[in-house]
Amino acid sequence: MKILLSNDDGVGAKGIAVLYQALMQIAEVTLVAPDRNCSGASNSLTLLNPLRATKLENGFISVNGTPTDCVHLGVNQLVDEMPDLVVAGINHGANLGDDTLYSGTVAAATEGRHLGLPAIAVSLCSHHGEHFETAAAVTISIIKGLASHPLPKDQIININVPDIPLSELKGVQVTRLGARHKAETMTKQTDPWGRDIYWYGSLGTESDAGEGTDFHAINNGYASVTPLSVDMTANESIKAVGEWLADLEINRAG
């Protein structure tokens, strides 16, 4: 098996190093990651500047771009053979609920799927994580399961793992995305030159963390596995929207 590994925390992050060592036990791994922390980059691309890839002494490849850039460049230019799987992580911090809209980790996996490859994103639910080995073990187990249960072509898997020893993990649960309340108000400060600067507030608290959600699984000692659809069409609304569109004046003209 050949795996392309990336992340959004940067090529020097602990999470990706731990996952690389674990994946090397089951596959050939090419690591292509941003040269800096790109948390919150979502699916952004570098379009107005050239990308540069630098091979480091440890064999990892550092790119002056986003997580999506790394996967796109890796698949199209930096590997000798097409990977069998794209893996993104281990992220330093949860990607639960609507976090997934902003996550560079989830975006890296999504780019793999856009390129026609199976893809998974994995996160450890602590920004100061200690038990990356737990997330790595869960990832290996999921990859082995995917070998006989492949994902549909328009889906990826989003894995979140509590920051606990593997011996304390209760298991793995399939979940749906929960939700958070809106983030706290932005903070306004003044820089040394007297100019206004702004900081994002803390993440919102859980607003939908009931049974069956990714939040609920994590809060109860389980790893969460959420299938995500790359096609964001709200199919259940097509008929209703079509009906009121038909009544618009622009559709009645002539």
Curated annotation (Swiss-Prot):
It catalyses: a ribonucleoside 5'-phosphate + H2O = a ribonucleoside + phosphate. It is an enzyme of class 3 (hydrolase). Its cofactor is a divalent metal cation. The keyword Metal-binding applies. Its main location: cytoplasm. GO terms for cellular component: cytoplasm. This is 5'-nucleotidase SurE. It comes from Pseudoalteromonas translucida (strain TAC 125). The gene is surE.
